[in-house]
Amino acid sequence: MKAHDDSVHHQVAQRLHESGLKYTAGRRQLVDLLLQHGRPASVPELLKKRPRLTQSSMYRNLADLEQMEIIHKVSGNDDHARYELTEDFIGHHHHLICVRCGDIDDFVVTASTERALDKALAHAARAAKFTVSGHQLDALGLCARCKR
């Protein structure tokens, strides 16, 4: 296990403990799977990696972790919700979403691009009398596999 993974597990355990919840083996396995997957993952993708996990317990743990803002859903372009750790644990990033198969990959832009995006959002928000609390950029297109 990488040092970063240890740090994430420690932070997750702490957040759950502060809310009176336990970092059970099932929750830890789920966080491990999401860390290993490295991008938003659907329940079928997660179950394929750990077939011994029951689907019902996975959904229950996903709901608990989502309620605690440890993970969140990322909507793709198919019938499967995908889950990933929140930015508190894996850092700020954006998504490339395939409109054909629904796969989602993470990407990071440079600090100067983030500043330009923040500036553009602030300008649009002022015009609309809107308060921006954060942003995420989802780029839609075709993944390499679907372009073939």
Label the predicted regions.
Residues 6-20:
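Short, Lys/Arg-enriched N-terminal segment that forms or immediately precedes the first helix
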Residues 68-148:
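Non-DNA-binding regulatory cores of transcription-related proteins
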Residues 45-49:
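A short acidic, leucine-rich amphipathic alpha-helix
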Residues 28-33:
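Pre-recognition alpha-helix immediately N-terminal to the DNA-recognition helix
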Residues 58-68:
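Basic amphipathic alpha-helical segments that dock to polyanions
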